[in-house]
Every structure is written in structure tokens, then in C-alpha cells.
């Protein structure tokens, strides 16, 4: 349908449909058909699961997938260019865009796994222990790394959009070789997985992490206010 639900997940359905020239009823029917295509086991409500489980799922399902598939598709492009350098005029530009996105995604996933996801898990652990202090947040607000990740998501989505345009929607010409057809199918699959990956983070994980941090910081702010009041009282001042 071409609706951007990963980086554009906050857009109202009516507005998104209008941009694509679609009716809401047609989109809802397509969503219902899509739901039937998934097994019950895959229909997990990630708005209800723990943030720890969600971050684990993103790493084991989506990060692992990208690390497995990105090198293979890159090698396939190089092989096609070596064997058929003149057959696919846009393939060199596609390869260059793909390699740049691949490099950015590798760094992006590492930052999530080393910095952001442990931060989110630590906040959830602090919530369970019910013993939060200002020392629980030595890296500042979770908003800082989230904003960086969101910008990098936008860049990845833009790269996918450009690659889709360059390949006419990841379509193969009638006379395309089997390797090129496999490449287009692989890019379509990778695009779908990355869109879902970004959706889980932008529209579920990140907003929930921000709300969790806000709830944890409220008692910390109250403690600071109480200490300030006690300090003023000790010196005979008002609050």
C-alpha cells in the first residue's frame, strides 16, 4: 500500500490514506487480510509485554536477521555487477546506496545494544525494585539516545525509499537473470522486516521508555524539592 507506518507511525490513518490516494475502507480490509496471514503465536501485543522482552525480541529477531541478510545481498549485487556490468544500468547506484545503508545500520544496531537497550532494561529493573535514586541515571535522559536512533531510522527509511524508486518497486525486468530476481526478492523481504523493526522501536518501545523514565524521575524530583526545602529551613529561609 506504500503507507509509512514505521517512521510515520504517528500520522492519522485518514491523512496517511489521503497522501497515497487510498480509501480508509480499502486499507482496513487489507489490514484484516494481513492479520489472517499470521499465526496466533506471532500476534504478540508488544504494548503489554515487558520492555526487556521487547528489546530482547528486537535483537534476536530483527538485529540477527539484518546481520545475516545484509552481507549476502551485498555479495549478490557484486556478483551480478561482475557478470552483467551493462545489463542493469542502475545497479551500481543501488549498490552504493545499499552499502552506505548497511554500514549505517551496523553502527546503529551496536549503539542500541550497547547503550540504549541496557539503559531501558535498567530503568525497568529499577521500577521493579521500587528503589530509584538519582544515581540510577548517570547518562542523563533516555530522550537523548532515542532522538539519535529516530533520526537514523529516518535515514534508513529514506534510503529504502530511494532504492525502491531506483528499482521500480524492487521489480525485475522480464529478461532479468535469476540472480537479479533473487536480489529483488531479498530486498523486498529486507524492506518489510526493517519497516516492522523500526515500527516496534519508534511507535512502541521508545514512547513506553520515555513514559517509564518520567514515572521514575517523579520521586527523584520530589526528593530534590524536599532536600531544598530542608536546606532553606535549616538556614531560616522560606521554601
Language-model features, listed with the residues they occupy:
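Small-residue-biased structural context
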Residues: 1-239
Amino acid at each position: 500500500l506504500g503507507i509509512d507506518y514505521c517512521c510515520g507511525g504517528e500520522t492519522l490513518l485518514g491523512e496517511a490514506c489521503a497522501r497515497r490516494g487510498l480509501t480508509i475502507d480499502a486499507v482496513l480490509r487489507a489490514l484484516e487480510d494481513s492479520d489472517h496471514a499470521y499465526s496466533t503465536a506471532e500476534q504478540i501485543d508488544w504494548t503489554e509485554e515487558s520492555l526487556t522482552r521487547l528489546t530482547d525480541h528486537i535483537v534476536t529477531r530483527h538485529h540477527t536477521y539484518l546481520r545475516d541478510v545484509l552481507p549476502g545481498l551485498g555479495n549478490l549485487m557484486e556478483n551480478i555487477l561482475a557478470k552483467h556490468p551493462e545489463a542493469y544500468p542502475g545497479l551500481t547506484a543501488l549498490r552504493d546506496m545499499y552499502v552506505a545503508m548497511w554500514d549505517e545500520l551496523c553502527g546503529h544496531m551496536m549503539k542500541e545494544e550497547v547503550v540504549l537497550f541496557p539503559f531501558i532494561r535498567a530503568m525497568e529493573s529499577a521500577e521493579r525494585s521500587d528503589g530509584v535514586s538519582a544515581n540510577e541515571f548517570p547518562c542523563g535522559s533516555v530522550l537523548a539516545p532515542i532522538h539519535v536512533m529516530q533520526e537514523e531510522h529516518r535515514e534508513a527509511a529514506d534510503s529504502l525509499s530511494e532504492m525502491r524508486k531506483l528499482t521500480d518497486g524492487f521489480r525485475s525486468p522480464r529478461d532479468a537473470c535469476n540472480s537479479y530476481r533473487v536480489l529483488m526478492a531479498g530486498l523486498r523481504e529486507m524492506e518489510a522486516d526493517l519497516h516492522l523493526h523500526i515500527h516496534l522501536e519508534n511507535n512502541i518501545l521508545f514512547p513506553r521508555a520515555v513514559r517509564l523514565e518520567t514515572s521514575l524521575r517523579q520521586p527523584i524530583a520530589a526528593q530534590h524539592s524536599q532536600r531544598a526545602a530542608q536546606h532553606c529551613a535549616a538556614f531560616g529561609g522560606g521554601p
